[in-house]
């Protein structure tokens, strides 16, 4: 990977890591489902008038939009709104990698290798440590924690739809898929917000919207979604997947660091242990025992 593309990849990692802090800031003055609906409305409009619709079956596009866009962010925004720390959310959301592996095995008959099973087992242990900390110390609201896991599972379901879309005969451009799939969750978000929050709350949040919320929406829509996914998709198309995908492991590192610096969030001892176990599980899933093999060859 060239130095320029390496810098771009790290830029996306930082942008996505900060994403969780921005969500928490944006939720201070707006209901979570309303904020999510406005985010995707800004992603879709006016870009949808300038980007061609991806030539994929409508049922796959709907499935992708309802899982990776609607369900994932409905659960994630509500989780953070209910007290899930932004930094910890950035880490727990990475459970999507393991959900994706298990769904891939079930849906496509993909074989699970030893390193994947070891990574999954270690990450599950890390999640159980976090649950234990939540139940005993109440440092993390259990509802927020479970909603974040639901968001991770929804992301994994979206990955399965994405795999089906990308294996289609007419493989769509990344930006086309991002923008057109953003159209799908807008109405569901607003309807859900209307049911759960009420029209008075929705109208009040729009009438009293402040610059902080506006900037949060701009960041979430244009920087994190359009710019972030645009660069990431370009890099995936330019290089082998194994060169690009592992860099996403740095997202929760940035998420935890930025939450500590900007929101003064601190991990308890058990939370830190759970975080280390999950990150180690992710590392094993991606790299396996490659480091150990390299040491043997070198010696």
From Swiss-Prot:
Compartment(s): Cell inner membrane
Protein source organism: Escherichia coli (strain K12)
All residue ranges annotated as the EamA domain in the record: 14-132, 153-287
UniProt family annotation: Belongs to the EamA transporter family.
A GO term, aspect molecular function: efflux transmembrane transporter activity
Membrane topology, Cytoplasmic segments: 1-6, 53-59, 109-116, 162-175, 238-243, 290-299
Keyword Mitochondrion (UniProt): no
Keyword Chloroplast: no
A Pfam family hit: EamA
Listed InterPro entries: AA-Vitamin_Transporters, EamA_dom
UniProt keyword annotations, A-Z: Amino-acid transport, Cell inner membrane, Cell membrane, Membrane, Repeat, Transmembrane, Transmembrane helix, Transport
Gene, per the UniProt record: eamA
Descriptive protein name: Probable amino-acid metabolite efflux pump
GO annotation, cellular component aspect: plasma membrane
Residue ranges annotated as Periplasmic topological domain: 28-31, 81-87, 138-140, 197-216, 265-268
GO term, biological process aspect, one: cysteine export across plasma membrane
Main function: May be an export pump for cysteine and other metabolites of the cysteine pathway (such as N-acetyl-L-serine (NAS) and O-acetyl-L-serine (OAS)), and for other amino acids and their metabolites.
Membrane-spanning residues: 7-27, 32-52, 60-80, 88-108, 117-137, 141-161, 176-196, 217-237, 244-264, 269-289
Protein topology in the membrane: Multi-pass membrane protein
């Amino acid at each position: 990977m060239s130095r320029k593309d390496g810098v771009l990849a790290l830029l996306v990692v930082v942008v996505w890591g900060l994403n969780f802090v921005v969500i928490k800031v944006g939720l201070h003055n707006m209901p979570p489902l309303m904020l999510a609906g406005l985010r995707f409305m800004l992603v879709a409009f006016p870009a949808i008038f300038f980007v061609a619709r991806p030539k994929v079956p409508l049922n796959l596009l709907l499935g992708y939009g309802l899982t990776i866009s609607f369900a994932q962010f409905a659960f994630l925004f509500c989780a953070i709104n209910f007290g899930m720390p932004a930094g910890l959310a950035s880490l727990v959301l990475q459970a999507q990698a393991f959900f994706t592996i298990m769904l891939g095995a079930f849906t496509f008959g993909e074989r699970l290798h030893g390193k994947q099973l070891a990574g999954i087992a270690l990450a599950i242990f890390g999640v159980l440590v976090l649950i234990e900390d939540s139940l005993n110390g109440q440092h993390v609201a259990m509802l927020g924690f479970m909603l974040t896991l639901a968001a991770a599972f929804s992301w994994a379901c979206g990955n399965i739809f994405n795999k089906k879309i990308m294996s289609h005969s007419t493989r769509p451009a990344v930006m086309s898929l991002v923008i057109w799939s953003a159209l799908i969750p807008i109405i569901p978000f607003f309807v859900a917000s209307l049911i759960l929050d009420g029209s008075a709350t929705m109208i009040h949040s729009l009438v009293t919207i402040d610059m902080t919320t506006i900037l949060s929406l701009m960041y979430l829509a244009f920087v994190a979604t359009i710019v972030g996914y645009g660069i990431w998709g370009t890099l995936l198309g330019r290089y082998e997947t194994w060169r690009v995908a592992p860099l996403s492991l740095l997202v929760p590192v940035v998420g935890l660091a930025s939450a500590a610096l900007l929101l003064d969030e601190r991990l308890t001892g058990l939370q830190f242990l759970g975080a280390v176990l999950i990150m180690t599980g992710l590392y094993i899933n991606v790299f396996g025992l490659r480091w150990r093999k390299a040491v043997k060859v070198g010696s």
